[in-house]
Amino acid sequence: MAQTYYKIGVQSTEVNSESIFFNPEVDSSDTVAVVSAGIVVVGTILTAFASFVNPGVVLISFGTLAPVLWPDPEEDPKKIWSQFMKHGEDLLNQTISTAVKEIALAHLNGFKDVLTYYERAFNDWKRNPSANTARLVSQRFENAHFNFVSNMPQLQLPTYDTLLLSCYTEAANLHLNLLHQGVQFADQWNADQPHSPMLKSSGTYYDELLVYIEKYINYCTKTYHKGLNHLKESEKITWDAYNTYRREMTLIVLDLVATFPFYDIRRFPRGVELELTREVYTSLDHLTRPPGLFTWLSDIELYTESVAEGDYLSGIRESKYYTGNQFFTMKNIYGNTNRLSKQLITLLPGEFMTHLSINRPFQTIAGINKLYSLIQKIVFTTFKNDNEYQKNFNVNNQNEPQETTNYPNDYGGSNSQKFKHNLSHFPLIIHKLEFAEYFHSIFALGWTHNSVNSQNLISESVSTQIPLVKAYEVTNNSVIRGPGFTGGDLIELRDKCSIKCKASSLKKYAISLFYAANNAIAVSIDVGDSGAGVLLQPTFSRKGNNNFTIQDLNYKDFQYHTLLVDIELPESEEIHIHLKREDDYEEGVILLIDKLEFKPIDENYTNEMNLEKAKKAVNVLFINATNALKMDVTDYHIDQVANLVECISDDLYAKEKIKFTPCIKFAKQLSQARNLLSDPNFNNLNAENSWTANTGVTIIEGDPLYKGRAIQLSAARDENFPTYLYQKIDESLLKPYTRYQLRGFVEGSQDLELDLVRYGATDIVMNVPGDLEILSYSAPINPCEEIETRLDTTCGALDRCKQSNYVNSAADVRPDQVNGDPHAFSFHIDTGTTDNNRNLGIWIIFKIATPDGYATFGNLELIELGPLSGEALAQVQRKEQKWGKNTTQKREEAAKLYAAAKQTINQLFADSQGTKLRFDTEFSNILSADKLVYKIRDVYSEVLSVIPGLNYDLFMELENRIQNAIDLYDARNTVTNGEFRNGLANWMASSNTEVRQIQAHPCWYSLGWNAQVAQSLNVKPDHGYVLRVTAKKEGIGNGYVTILDCANHIDTLTFSSCDSGFTTSSNELAAYVTKTLEIFPDTDQIRIEIGETRSTFYVESVDLIRMED
């Protein structure tokens, strides 16, 4: 009879009896051996990870795995590896050449030798730590590691890669286990042999471990899919062959690959509980299930019907439930359930079906050997609380020969429950053979791994990874098949998902998501009564279009995101966790979530995490293999890393702390060296080469958010009197066409203005919420108990060691406002050409100009980012050109005003050196010249009026000469305060007189005929004097200035309203006139009196000048 085969992926059209109703193949001894070995290795590793609670103990000794992979070391040490190769050949119907086999077996046996030698040396060192034993174990470890690195490629030859995949995966596991021990113990080996050069550290081996975890995961997964695709594309392939490859390579390869990430000892220093949620099947394509939430069997109803051959199993109704939702079951019906009788097989909570024995009669019809008939007996073996039970279904027909098939094959008869699988799916169809009146049972059995916990129980001692497919509710059809290395299917979160968990004890946990996304996606997470919103950053860039498949993803496309808040879970209570995607789902914008991780928080965990955080944080400060600081590592970040180092336990990790301290000090030195700011630590404000500040600025120390000093700006009186802090970076420190960046950290601010000034001002306003809650404390205080970015009500003081908001150990996110953290800021400014003579520099100005403003900030730094190019270069060139043109115009305008004012000022003096005023220079002349000086614009910065502007030098040159003229004027005037610039100081005045400002000039003003001011003066009787008065009289009556001496000699200058036509020199102020009078006092004292007879009298100045020889 012609043979008809399945074409994978296409619904079969011609179903031949031989292709479906065949006698199930009895597994070969090779298959039993290799699948058994694979299952045992995976079970051993899962158990080891879950119990790895002591960092000083080896995770898995080589002696534990050796009996599995080399079961007969004396008789045939290569036996199991040969069987792995034979199994690969059988699955893919291909052959490995003898030469390739021999080479591969030689390398695999070589792995055993180097691991054996290493483990002997390791045990000797453990028993007797010394320089000699440490040197030997280091050498043998490195030899073993080098052996794997050199020879693993021999197991991945392109022609034979799929056939050797099982061998490769087992060997990769041995290598990762070896590197895991290197990370654990290398630093201890080095400490025991301090004088040995060129030793690799634990950190070096950790970097290599991460590289090989990723490499092995990606290679094994892609090679598995390569073999699967080869079967799909084969012309003569049955579903059974295809499914056998999936099932057995899942048990040997994918299950083991799913454990590889957890060799990362620094992420999982105290072990982890894992679960494999994938489902493996026996038998037929159309009886397997598509991806869906993980389910549990609660009972099976078996229905019976009678035919000529006797009673038989005619239908099955399964009852299933989602994890944690056992009171809501789903029913699946297969076959005919409306028949003779039924039998219920019930599973109690915690009871699982682990084994089935199925009896079916068989006949030989039309040349078909052992054509199986209907099911008449099933023995279900269940497991609960380490006890096995049997539950039977039996129709008691013995009319035909019977054959019993066991499911699943126990692959070596292991009695350990940790290596078993649980029945998850039992679909059935009844088929009638067309060429004979004969009915046959066709069924499939789905099995899930026993590592899956039915309660989502969270461990109190190690990390717990709970696959999200164990949720009880998910919307929008969002369960998809996993990529192969996750141990099961994934949730594509399109809307929301809910899962139940239960903690084994009252404890705090750090909760993380293991996810992949191709865009930044906001997700809200509710854990019991606690809630948090997170922004998951993209982990890969490929879009989810029609060409995208989950197999396109690599291991590094998945990342962890840890919630910033540790959450306390109650003991033995169900906790509902709800995840909701906050954006509107868009086709192609993918968010895949694999697992939730719960890490218990206790003192040991905290100490270990402090050490791991410090290690990671210190390692990423520097550019690889150099002593250069990474550009995006800020000064604040370094301080926070220093805090992490300080918080390493002295009792437990003194060596590590001593090792990291010089590194962090060196990083701080590099940060200070590249910082162009003077006095960035605010050691001495208003000193030379420091910051300039006014009285509203305070230096603060002891703020728990800052390791060093910070600065505080208080509110301004008004916008004309801001609180300010500024500094100029000298031109000599700058490079042409270069970008510089100002960075810092703001604790909180309101109306804080920042201006970066070179070619005009870059005005920035920072309103930063003061949301970093700080508990009060009293000194002295442990530095590790100073700060917590959130309020911790369980502790009497803040714990700086728990501070994680602003310390990113990966240092891969720039702390600026654009990326979402308002407390950290970074802004850039570009230079064009540089000119040390012009010394344009960069001005950095902070100010508060509002009565409600305030700010506290620190860790300021200005660093060089690098040379400009492209659009940035063109932009700064345009900006500099525009600024230069505008500046030239302003300078030209100022030069004209300068020339006019200078000419006027020159006329004030009697000589070019400015040592003497002209005799006829009046104070009003000086004021008029000063007005011309003040017409010059851009004297001070537009940003802050105390900072020199473009024309400051011109202005100050003229203003200094004006002040010189005033000083000379005051020096020659015998009358003190004769211009009333200081009001009525030095004058004896009646109550009805005052000084008023007339057109910005101070003038004495009388309020009545009896108003009077007077001043007594000392003079030299042998000299003549000139009395010069500038005044104005309004209305009727006269104003007078009288001078008299002790000999009653009286001289008077009289002013009237008719003086405007007087021929004396006129003043700029309307109607003011200047009159003079020569006097020759006969005594050494005189008195000047000013008054009027009626109406109003104004006096601008009174001068008494001694005559020159």
UniProtKB/Swiss-Prot annotation:
The keyword Membrane does not apply. The keyword Transcription regulation does not apply. Signal peptide: none annotated. Keywords: Sporulation, Toxin, Virulence. GO terms for molecular function: signaling receptor binding; toxin activity. It comes from the Bacteria. GO terms for biological process: sporulation resulting in formation of a cellular spore; symbiont-mediated killing of host cell. Belongs to the delta endotoxin family. Toxic segment of the protein is located in the N-terminus. Promotes colloidosmotic lysis by binding to the midgut epithelial cells of insects. This is Pesticidal crystal protein Cry28Aa. It comes from Bacillus thuringiensis subsp. finitimus.
